[in-house]
Structures are given as C-alpha cells and as structure tokens.
Amino acid sequence: LSLHDALPICDILLSGYHGENKYKYPIIPDRFPGKGPLGGLEACFRKAKNPYCLVLGVDVPLVPAEELAALIRQSLHSDAKAVILSHGGHEEPLMGVYCTDLADAMLEEITERKGAVFAFLRKNGYECYESQVADWYFSNINDPETYKEIPGNHFIEKYV
C-alpha cells in the first residue's frame, strides 16, 4: 500500500534539506536557522495549507502507511493539538500529527528558550498513539545499504 493510497495527503513540504533542489515538493527554509527540528516545523506550519500536518522524517522510510493512517485517525478523535507516535515505550516527536496553529507557540519556544521539541510538547500538551508494529520499522536509515539490510534481517523468505 503506497503512502498516497493510504493517506489523504494533498500538501507535502520538505524541511531541513540543504542539497540540490531535485524534488517536486517545495523546500521550506527555516525562518530562524540553527533552531533544530522545531524551527523547521515552525516554518512549515506557516506555509501549510491545511489545519493539520503529518510530520515524518525522511530517515524512517519503513514506517507502514497503515500505522500513519492509524495515527491520523487517533488525532482526529483527540483534543490534543499534537499526537505523536510511540513504539515500545519510545516516543517519536518527529512522527506525529500537529495542529498548524501551534506555529506561534513554536516561535515562542525557539526564540525565548532552547527550542527542544519535547520541552515544547510538555508545555503545550500532547498524546501518544501506541504503534502495534515491531520496533525495527522505526529504524533510522540514512544510507542505501542500511535500507537494504534492515528489512532483509527481519523478513523471512517464503521460498528459499
């Protein structure tokens, strides 16, 4: 199941990318460079066309689309302005659904304090969606070799 088939995503923004512009999606520069992930979220939320954003790092390509759909479903039934994914007791603040009207609160965090994502979440409130899939789906992958290696270590070939 592809991401576009599983999720009603109509607006994709890239943050934190400093390489050659070779993607069809807009790259949103941080308004306050050097403020980490929260600075990127703040800039993207100001450009977003929708009241909610699904936040997902490019270095976690194995997260199943079905898990993201479940995360979105929980966020739709939540009063929290941020619903982040949790797996095996590990909370992932860069895998979540955020209300874009949090941009002003993010601005305050990055200009008046350190700009830590968890400090922001603790101050503004959040809830967790507890994933039901194995932890390895959330592996941080930054190179093609690791991308090929991780699934191979966890899938059993049916026809050997």
Show the residue positions of the predicted features.
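Nucleotide and nucleotide-moiety/phosphate-recognizing core
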Residues: 1-114, 119-138, 144-157
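Cytosolic-facing loops and C-terminal tails of multi-pass membrane proteins
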Residues: 160
